[in-house]
Amino acid sequence: MHKSHLDSVAPQLRSDLQCIKASSSSLCDQMECMLRVLQDFKRSSPPPSPDIEKPCVVPPRRAPRRDNRISHRTSDLSEADSACCMDLPSDVSPGSCGQRGLEWDSGYSEVSGGSLRGEEDDIVEEESETSVPTVVLRRLPTPSCQRLSSGGFLNSRQGRIRPKSTSDVCLEQWRGIGLGSDSQDWTGCLLSQSRSRQPLVLGDNSFADLVKQWMDLPENVDEEGRRVRDGGRWLHKPHGFLISLSGNVKRRLGNMSRLRRSEQEAVKRMSCPQLGCRPLSLYYHQSLSDIAEASTNLLHCRSRQPIICNEGAGFL
């Protein structure tokens, strides 16, 4: 039985194998045909141009010229800062940039703010092909005595007025207050100007505030000489300070004492005495001695207010 079944399947398998061989041969023919087409396409295409094969060369970018920027910065620094100078190379004549020379003044200028080092880092040097001389900015070490002694305007070489520093302005302002103290009341100077630039607020301790602000004021030349001579004096202040108080301070002291007196008088006066501050109680609980003390206290009372007893009014 199995043999008969295998005999029936064998021709079917042969036919399948023949079909597979035929399909494989057709696939081989198709592959050969495709290879021929590709070779023909290569032969028919034009040869590649030599320009395409070369890589694209990007031209180098040159740094922008910064002559104007350097000149603007040096001019701004000459007007803003007062403790700088310019250091030029040896091949550059000093006449070209000499007019931009920066002169010193006393103190620390608010406009400069110590920004020279940051600006030096920002300046990019140009290439050697341009041959443009670079300007190097450096700060001159100014002696402390020169910085502290100068107090006026310093004129530059071009005749322009130099800006004052904050220390010079404050020094001149307080010197003017100290010199004009003879003609002007010092309390007016305190109320209008103070070292902290803050309005003077007078509170409960207004006298202490005035004294503290007065101690901060600069002294006159005569007072400074007296302070040097009398070095052991308490706080180096004149002896007649407490005696020569202005009328303004005296008026404020009088107002303070008057307010305290009015607060004391604001306490309500009782028409009858407090009977020795004894606690209030009913009348029939008190003894005869307490009633006698109450009558004596009423006799010594100076009030003229009516006392109503048994529906009858009378005055002591």
Swiss-Prot record:
Q: Where does the record place Acidic residues bias?
A: 119-129
Write out the biased-composition intervals (Basic and acidic residues): 65-74
Cite the residue spans of the region called Inka box: 182-219
In its UniProt record, a GO molecular function of this protein is: protein kinase binding
List the subcellular locations: Nucleus
What is the first-listed, main subcellular location in coarse terms? nucleus
Pfam families xref list: FAM212
Protein name as catalogued: PAK4-inhibitor inka2
| Recorded name of the encoding gene | inka1-b
